[in-house]
Design a protein with these regions (language model features):
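Long, internal low-complexity/basic segments
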Residues: 23-28, 35, 40, 72, ...
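A short aromatic-rich beta-strand->coil structural motif
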Residues: 30, 36, 161, 233, ...
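Active-site segment of extracytoplasmic enzymes that catalyze sulfate/phosphate-ester chemistry
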Residues: 32-33, 40-143, 148, 202-203, ...
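C-terminal cap/loop subdomain of S1 sulfatases and analogous C-terminal strand-loop tails that border
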Residues: 181, 319-345, 360-364, 368, ...
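A long, amphipathic alpha-helix that forms part
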Residues: 224, 228-241, 268-309, 326
Length: 511
């Protein structure tokens, strides 16, 4: 398959360059492959200057194929937890602006870790998720990406994890935000079970909230959730392929989110190299995810539509490391520090690959920093829907020019998490941060600690330069504060000081 796809990519590129001026292809297909909790190095594709031990451990041949066909983004970012990333994807808004700053599930309710917190009273964030109406409390009113694409003639398919709105709210069902087809998406952000023999959790009446819906025909079968989703995707793709309609496939896998479970198709090799139990399960889930990617790529190739299809691969946050894993906690994303839930690089830097047969570039790697907010305007540019109207003001900046090797200004990237995740570990808490160029500034709300890192020299964030480079620290504190104020960002209330947490530029170091 790898040889076929590489040859096809060369041929497709040649044909495109020879006919691009005629603009024969007006509406490319879009496949957005979103993985849950996949770490930056949880793949045999390296996104760093050096190969790591994790690149040598995991087996992701189809990611390798996609990377060889397309372009790797080595400085790609999401938010530290899942729902904020997914809302940013659907709206083009930064989490500080859309205020779905933590993961959603229960309606009209903050997260358990936020209730009765000893230090903070957390803001009344948008825990009910996305809304297409402006009258629903604690939601972000926005025009969703799939609705725009549908309105522009796209057949829209959602498969897998949705996690866009609380239980009972319209956005918990992808059909209500512009998808024509919804395969197994609902309010919950994880499955009760990945196993068909467990009916994907539908046997457990106590935890029905997590049970995966809509896959009844696979109940009782020895099939992993990822395989069932892949089979459903292949079936649903036939309609737009046969009718030659442009399509948007949002394949949003539940993998590799906990609960960690073995995919028996891929488990033996990891047992044979001496991994511990949970790591065997995790590695098999990584390979299971990759196999699903390969299934889709092969189908697009076999049906002769890959030549008119843009494929984007992304993870919704950094790799899990604080819980559920064996080995040293907060070390599963080395050389990055910490993991999911953290503002350190292990919690927010993620693997990203873009394959587009329509952009003239010989580069295989892009180091320009991009963030999940950027996907909305990029996909609209890919699909020539730039002029579409939407109600929200977006933060994202299209990364499409980068695929043409054009110079793009390095805008600041912002993170804002005025919430509490639950697990403890380095960089996990309540915080705001900004990256501008090689510099990253972090402001922890609970401790009032500030940190500055030069990521080009210190990717592991071991050397805090806050006292060495006060001028750069103050500059970034000002940039961060100006942005947070401009979007009316929420801040926690400190019960100890009886006051709202100060803005970053109000830190004593700068005053």
């Amino acid at each position: 398959m790898m040889t076929l796809l590489r040859s096809f990519f060369v041929l497709t590129t040649f044909l495109f360059l020879s006919c691009n001026s005629s603009n024969e292809i007006s509406k490319p297909n879009i496949v957005l492959f979103m993985v849950d909790d996949l770490g930056w190095q949880d793949t045999s594709v390296s996104f760093w200057k050096n190969e790591t031990k994790f690149n040598r451990l995991y087996n992701t041949p189809n990611m390798e194929i996609l990377a060889n066909m397309g372009v790797k983004f080595t400085n790609a970012y999401a938010t530290p937890v899942c729902s904020p990333s997914r809302i940013s994807l659907m709206t083009g808004m930064n989490a500080a602006k859309h205020r779905v700053t933590n993961w959603t599930l229960n309606p009209n309710k903050k997260k358990p870790a936020e209730i009765n917190h000893k230090i903070f009273e957390f803001p009344d964030w948008n825990y009910n998720g996305l809304s297409t109406l402006d009258s629903i409390s604690n939601t972000i009113y926005a025009t969703p990406l799939p609705q725009i694409l549908k309105d522009n003639g796209y057949y829209t398919i959602h498969a897998g994890k949705a996690h866009l709105g609380a239980i009972g709210y319209p956005s918990s069902n992808p059909l209500n935000i512009g998808f024509d087809i919804n395969i197994a998406g609902h309010a919950a952000g994880a499955p009760q079970s990945y196993l068909g023999v467990d009916n994907f959790g539908n046997n457990n009446s106590k935890n029905k909230i997590w049970a995966v819906p809509g896959l009844e025909k696979y109940h009782g079968k020895d099939i992993f959730l990822t395989q069932a989703l892949s089979e459903e995707v292949l079936e649903k793709l036939q309609k737009p392929i046969n009718s030659k309609s442009p399509f948007f496939l949002y394949f949003s896998l539940y993998n590799v989110h906990a609960p960690l479970m073995e995919d028996n198709r891929f488990v033996e090799k990891y047992k044979n190299i001496g991994l511990k139990n949970s790591e065997i399960k995790y590695a098999s889930m990584v390979e299971s995810m990759d196999h699903a990617l390969g299934v889709v790529l092969k189908e697009l190739e076999n049906k002769d539509v890959l030549k008119n299809t843009i494929v984007v691969f992304m993870s919704d946050n950094g790799g899990l490391s604080a819980v559920a894993r064996e080995g040293e906690k907060h070390n599963h994303n080395y050389p990055l520090k910490s993991g999911k839930g953290s503002i350190y690089e292990g919690g927010i830097r993620v693997p990203m690959i873009v394959y587009s047969p329509f952009h003239k570039t010989n580069i295989r790697e892009i180091n320009h920093p991009v963030i999940i907010d950027d996907f909305f305007p990029s996909i609209l540019e890919f699909t020539k829907c730039e002029e579409s109207s939407f109600v929200q003001n977006i933060d994202g900046q299209s990364f499409v020019p980068l695929l043409n090797n054009e110079t793009v200004e390095k805008k600041p990237l912002f993170w804002h998490y005025p919430n509490w995740w639950g697990p403890i570990g380095p960089g996990i808490g309540s915080y705001s941060a900004v990256r501008q160029g090689k510099w990253k500034f972090i402001y922890f709300h609970d401790t009032q600690i500030i940190e500055l890192y030069n990521l080009e020299k210190d990717i592991s964030e071991n050397n805090n330069l806050i006292s060495v480079n006060t001028s750069k620290s103050q500059l970034l504190a000002n940039v961060l504060t100006k942005y947070l104020k401009s979007v009316d960002a929420q801040m926690p209330y400190n019960k100890i000081t009886n006051s709202i947490v100060p803005w970053p530029d109000e830190h004593p170091l700068f005053n």
